[in-house]
Amino acid sequence: RGFILYTTKVIIQKNHSMITSAKTSTSEMIKVEQKLSVQYKIFADDSSAIRSLDWDRSRFDIEFGLRNGTTYNSFIIKGQKLAIIDTSHAKFEKLWFEQLLREVNPEEIDYLITSHTEPDHSGLIGNLLTLNPQIIVVGSKLALKFIEDQIHIPFKSLEVKSGQYLDLGANPTSGVNHNIEFISAPNLHWPDTIFSYDHGTNVLYTCDAFGLHYCSDEFFDNDQKEIYEDFRFYYDCLMGPNARSVLQAIKRIDKLPRLKTIAVGHGPLLHNQVNFWKEKYSEWSSNKSKGNEFVSVC
């Protein structure tokens, strides 16, 4: 059950020509202007991540600037059936699919769980369905509607609500049963958002919630001080305006049996200090819902 970790790197020069991609260890990665890379890691039983690292992105949407780039994280869960959680930004099409095809046969993918449909997480859905039109897209009612409007091709779908389950069955090698429970989390930060909790690994997949715009080859939250300000700034910009929705989501999370890892859609996965980060969301949201004023500077 050891971790597997490697990255694929591609460097886009100023003239936008592309240097040949190659598999390399993280220690060999050299930061250059406009660099994109992909990191793969097994982080729990039958569960792995493909992290698309956008090292030099300087602005996200129109809300705020970025000082440390960002990542777009997607996930693979292999039970008896195979599920992908989220895809990536369209700019990562080549790198993301190269990595995905190393790990799985697209014809064996049964489900694509869509946490929410902002293009940085859903940008490759149409491409994936082209590889395998039999994939069942799982999401909230709004998410499925948004996907229809985005890709303009027919697809199989499964609408889910809070408290419903999707049983992927037991992995034939590990014996771990991956039963996915869905948690509605509207307005975090889009109205279509759902969380996915794997009862087999105690991993909660939250997409934007609990994330941060921080690009690093550190896979987990190994240095609390290093990422704290970016975590707080991200909360203030994206989650703070919907503080009451955050508190409602946390109430639902607190009913889960155990929380070992929060697999976020941006930045490092929260594993070493899960309770600390969750408590900060609760503290900040409680203050905002009471009308307490504060200013975040990052």
Segment roles from a protein language model:
Residues 85-87, 109-117, 137-140, 204-208, ...:
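Active-site neighborhood of phospho(di)ester-bond hydrolases with catalytic His/Asp-centered motifs
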Residues 89-90, 119, 211, 269:
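Short, glycine/acidic-enriched loop or turn micro-motifs at the edges of active sites
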Residues 21-37, 106, 241-245, 249-298:
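Acidic/His-rich, metal-assisted hydrolase cores and their charged scaffolds
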Residues 40-104, 195-198, 202-206, 296:
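Conserved beta-strand hairpin/beta-sheet module of binuclear metal-dependent hydrolase folds
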Residues 35, 42-45, 138-272:
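Metallo-beta-lactamase
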Residues 1-20:
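N-terminal amphipathic/basic-hydrophobic helices that include classical n-h-c signal peptides
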Residues 80, 91-138:
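Active-site metal-binding motif and surrounding structural segment of the metallo-beta-lactamase
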